[in-house]
Regions:
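Single conserved hydrophobic/aromatic residue that forms the stacking wall/gate
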Residues: 1-15
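Alpha-helix C-terminal capping/helix-to-coil transition sites in glycosyltransferase folds
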Residues: 8, 75-76, 80, 125
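C-terminal substrate-binding/catalytic lobe of Rossmann-fold NAD(P)-dependent oxidoreductases
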Residues: 25-27, 32-71, 154-271
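Rossmann-fold NAD(P)-binding glycine/threonine-rich loop
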Residues: 94, 107-128, 139
Length: 271
């Protein structure tokens, strides 16, 4: 009986070609993104969820065990996907380190500067995948925007507009800041982010990147990068039609990260 169970377990962690499947711990398993990821993984043959973590485990109806704390997880895993809350960053990093450096795919937004520094420091000894947006499309747009900024130089003003549903708490969005940081990294000199022109009664500075937030309805997520020059405007835009696309990116990242060594990885590795 024990041998039979063991063989069944071995079969469920290998795909039809005999390759080892990626075993995932899903933090935030009872949230909207958790449900998307659970459904997506159930349809794939290269990975499986072996355990979930969520404070609201009563809502968990999936076929895997769920816990209220990651410290309670005993199932062996190859990678952690986190779609929970910024406050859980430290416990997740500690757990990953204690388990021999399990890769962590961090998809949660709203980290403070101190938390970003914490995960960056952890990546020196642990494999960490961190992106403020798991969409392949938005990350391709980011690379295109960087290319445009290099070519256009300071002859074009840059403005970023982000739109989200009326339940989103943080503003500007993590993705808008990700875009701004990427653009600032390829510009000459220092860049200032301008969030509120109402408070600044002066002409626009060339060194500025304007960032504007819109909240309303059920908008999943829209981002525009505007390059405004003399007599011409170039706009790069991305519109998310469903949060499911973020689940696809997260699971692809998890499979990619399985077995990776220490370092800080992001979506540029998948673009």
């Amino acid at each position: 009986l024990h041998l039979s169970i063991r063989r069944q377990r071995q079969m469920c962690i290998r795909d039809r070609n005999g390759r080892k499947m990626t075993r995932i711990i899903l933090c935030g398993c009872c949230g909207k993104m958790g449900h998307f990821i659970t459904q997506l993984v159930s349809e794939r043959t290269d990975c499986e969820i072996v355990a979930g973590v969520d404070l609201n485990v009563n809502a968990q109806t999936a076929s895997y065990p769920a816990y209220t704390s990651i410290d309670q997880v005993t199932e062996a895993a190859d990678v952690i996907i986190d779609f929970s809350h910024p406050s859980l960053l430290t416990p997740i990093l500690h757990y990953a380190a204690e388990k021999g450096g399990i890769p962590a795919v961090l998809c949660t937004t709203g980290y403070t500067a101190e938390q970003t520094a914490e995960l960056t420091k952890a990546s020196e000894t642990q494999p960490i995948f961190y992106s403020r947006n798991m969409s392949l499309g938005i990350n391709l747009m980011l690379e295109l925007a960087k290319k445009a900024a290099k070519v256009l130089g300071d002859q074009f003003d840059i403005e970023i507009v982000e739109k989200h549903h009326n339940q989103k708490i943080d503003a500007p969005s993590g993705t808008a800041l990700m875009l701004a940081d990427a653009l600032a990294s390829v510009r000459d000199g220092e860049t200032q982010y301008m969030y509120d022109r109402h408070a600044q009664r002066k002409k626009r500075e060339k060194s500025e990147i304007g960032i504007h937030s819109v909240r309303g309805g059920t908008i999943v997520g829209e981002h525009e990068v505007i390059f405004a020059g003399n007599n011409e405007v170039i706009t790069l835009s991305h519109s998310a039609q469903s949060k499911e696309l973020f689940a696809v990116g997260a699971v692809n990242a998890a499979v990619f990260m399985s077995g990776k060594g220490p370092g800080l990885y992001d979506m540029s590795a998948l673009v």
